[in-house]
C-alpha cells in the first residue's frame, strides 16, 4: 500500500500500522470489540525456584496508533474464567524433559497493559503466575518417562494469548488548585456497598 495513503488513514483514525518482527497478524472476528494476539514462540512462564511470579511475553510486533488512540492489552475472557491454557513440561534430574501434559488450565493471568500512541518498540503481554497448580481438561494428553524433579508451564507457539482493545485517550491539562467539593459523594474503597 502507498505510504502516503497509509499515513492519511492513520491520521484519520481509520487504520493502525502493524510491523511484524517475528510475530503474527492479530486475529479479529466480525465486529469483535478486540483483536487476539498470538504467542510467537514457546514460552516458559515459571521456573522451579519461582512458583509464582510475573513477567512478560514478547509478541514480536510493533504498532503505530492513530493520534488520540491507546491500545489496552488484556486477558481473553476464557482465560480469566477458566485459567490460562498451557502445557506442563516435567523436568528430570539432568535438567531434561522427562514428560508432559498438554492442554491444562492454570491460574495465570494476563495483566492489563497500555500501548501509548507514541510507543514503537515491541509490544508484550504482562502475566502473573498465581499458583503452581493446574487442572487437566478433556483434551489433555499425558506422558511421563521417569521421575521428575519439577515442572514448568509452557505457552505454546500460536496460542491466542491476549486481547487488544483500542480506545480513545483524552489528555487534559493539569491545573493546581482547590477542588469543588459541592458534589463530593464521600466514602472510598468499598463504601458504596454490595447491594
Language-model features and meaning:
Residues 1-195:
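DUTPase catalytic domain/fold
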Amino acid at each position: 500500500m502507498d505510504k502516503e495513503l497509509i499515513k492519511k488513514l492513520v491520521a484519520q483514525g481509520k487504520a493502525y500500522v502493524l510491523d511484524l518482527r517475528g510475530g503474527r497478524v492479530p486475529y479479529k472476528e466480525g465486529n469483535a470489540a478486540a483483536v487476539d494476539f498470538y504467542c510467537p514462540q514457546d514460552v516458559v512462564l515459571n521456573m522451579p525456584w519461582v512458583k509464582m511470579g510475573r513477567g512478560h511475553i514478547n509478541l514480536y510486533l510493533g504498532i503505530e496508533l492513530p493520534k488520540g488512540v491507546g491500545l489496552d492489552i488484556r486477558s481473553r475472557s476464557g482465560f480469566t474464567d477458566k485459567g490460562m491454557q498451557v502445557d506442563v513440561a516435567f523436568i528430570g534430574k539432568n535438567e531434561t524433559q522427562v514428560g508432559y501434559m498438554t492442554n491444562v488450565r492454570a491460574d495465570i493471568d494476563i495483566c492489563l497493559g497500555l500501548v501509548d500512541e507514541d510507543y514503537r518498540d515491541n509490544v508484550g503481554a504482562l502475566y502473573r503466575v498465581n499458583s503452581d497448580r493446574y487442572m487437566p481438561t478433556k483434551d489433555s494428553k499425558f506422558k511421563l518417562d521417569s521421575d521428575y524433579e519439577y515442572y514448568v508451564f509452557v505457552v505454546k507457539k500460536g496460542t491466542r494469548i491476549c486481547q487488544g482493545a483500542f480506545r480513545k485517550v483524552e489528555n487534559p491539562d493539569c491545573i493546581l488548585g482547590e477542588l469543588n467539593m459541592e458534589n463530593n459523594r464521600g466514602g472510598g474503597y468499598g463504601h458504596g456497598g454490595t447491594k
